[in-house]
Amino acid sequence: LKKEGAVFIGKASMDELAMGGTNTTCYTGNAHNPWNTDRMTGGSSGGSAALVASGVVPMAIGSDTGDSVRKPAAFNGVVGVKPTYGRISRYGIIPYASSLDHVGYFTGNVEDACLTLEVLAGRDERDMTSSFRPVEEYSANLNSDMHGKKIAIISNVIEGIEKQDTKDAFYAVVEKLRARGAVVEEYSFNEDLMKAILPTYFIIANCEATSNHSNLDGIRFGVREDGADLQEIMTNSRTKGFGPLIRRRFVIGSYGLFEENQEKIFRKAQKVRRVIVEAMNACFKEYDAIIAPASGDIAPLLEGNTVETLSDEHIIAENYMAMANFSGGPSMTVPMGFKEECPLGLNITCNAWNEQTMFDIAKAIEEETGLKDLHAEVK
């Protein structure tokens, strides 16, 4: 970015260690949604999304391990992109879960999203997971003609959403894609697999995070607390140095990594991940992309928000986007409408290295809705 003349103005708020979906666990306090400051930005990269939505910057960087770029993009009315695993170097990023982590970013419109990826993508010898594949000219090749495109609607997500306003906004976009020549059809994944996405994500992510952050012991890295001996120093440091959400995730991760639990918890989750990816691959043999609302509703309230954690809306509709982290394929969110003066988002996911197709569909949606470069007036 610096090489291409970008000017950096600061760092954005984010959830602690990028673990969270609310941006309410940041050391500096809650991030507030610029469209309604009583509501969340989403997380973990919510601060970056809010800055683009406020018009402070045209582009901001984030990271996406489960949906940490794409969900805040939906809540803040901006474009959020998670490219293919390995498309952007992760050098310099503090890891959360290495097999799921992606560098992502936010922009105000699809064309800027194309240009940004052209700059950020490419091989980096400092990151062995970065790809040698040539970087495409996404912006020059941008084509919003939908004739010949075959798109699948994830019906499991639609069925899990309770708010009719969200469904209406989504299907209004679907009809516009059909009018442009796209074939858009309902597609059902195995319901048990869809319900397995969230627990599979939490097991893999928490186990990998526990390993990645084991050096934050107050001795080598991190906040140091006093203690009578080495064990007490480490215990106090890792207890007082992290918020309750992080401590809970580390406990879950440690449990999954116990020798006696690895096969039945961690490795089993990896096997389930593979089955989910195989189901996605089967879908992509028939379709160019899969789409669904990025969330069941507008951004939740910061106070008084209640979540039915066992509902299909929470288990499936609010957490299905981790599928793209499992597969490593490109996925992005674009604005699709408004409710109560707050934005709603639509997610597009494609097979690995099909960023151009993803951008083309996003551009068609943007042209039909007219929702681009949206800037909230913060009150």
Predicted regions and their residues:
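Short glycine-rich anion-binding loops that position phosphate/pyrophosphate groups of nucleotides
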Residues: 218-219, 256-258, 295-298
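Structural helix-boundary/capping segments
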Residues: 3, 54-59, 65-160, 171-180, ...
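Short, surface-exposed loop/helix-turn segments at secondary-structure junctions
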Residues: 129-133, 201, 226-230, 263-268, ...
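Charged, often glycine-rich, active-site loop that binds/positions anionic groups
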Residues: 29, 196-212
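General small-molecule cofactor/ligand-binding pocket signal
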Residues: 9, 183-190, 332
